[in-house]
């Protein structure tokens, strides 16, 4: 589901979201970004 990475991957304060992107890609999304320290899959 679209927000399955929110709890699994933490988002750093300053734009580092590789963990979020990797999680989203594994879940079948094109990637992910961080919004308010939460991982959102794109």
From Swiss-Prot:
Keyword terms of this UniProt record: Disulfide bond, Ion channel impairing toxin, Knottin, Neurotoxin, Potassium channel impairing toxin, Secreted, Toxin, Voltage-gated potassium channel impairing toxin
Cysteines joined through disulfide linkages: 5-23, 11-34, 20-39, 24-41
One GO molecular-function entry: potassium channel inhibitor activity
Pfam families in UniProt: Toxin_17
GO terms for cellular component: extracellular region
Compartment(s) of residence: Secreted
Keyword Membrane: no
Tissue specificity note: Expressed by the venom gland.
Main location: secreted
SUPFAM superfamilies found in the cross-reference section: Scorpion toxin-like
Domain notes per entry: The presence of a 'disulfide through disulfide knot' structurally defines this protein as a knottin.
Purpose of the protein: Blocks Kv11/ERG potassium channels.
Similarity field: Belongs to the ergtoxin family. Gamma-KTx 1 subfamily.
Name by which UniProt lists this protein: Potassium channel toxin gamma-KTx 1.6
Organism (species): Centruroides exilicauda (Bark scorpion)
């Amino acid at each position: 589901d679209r927000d399955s990475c929110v709890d699994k991957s933490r988002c750093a304060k300053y734009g580092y979201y590789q963990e979020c992107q990797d999680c989203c890609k594994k879940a079948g999304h094109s990637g992910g970004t961080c919004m308010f320290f939460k991982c959102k899959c794109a």
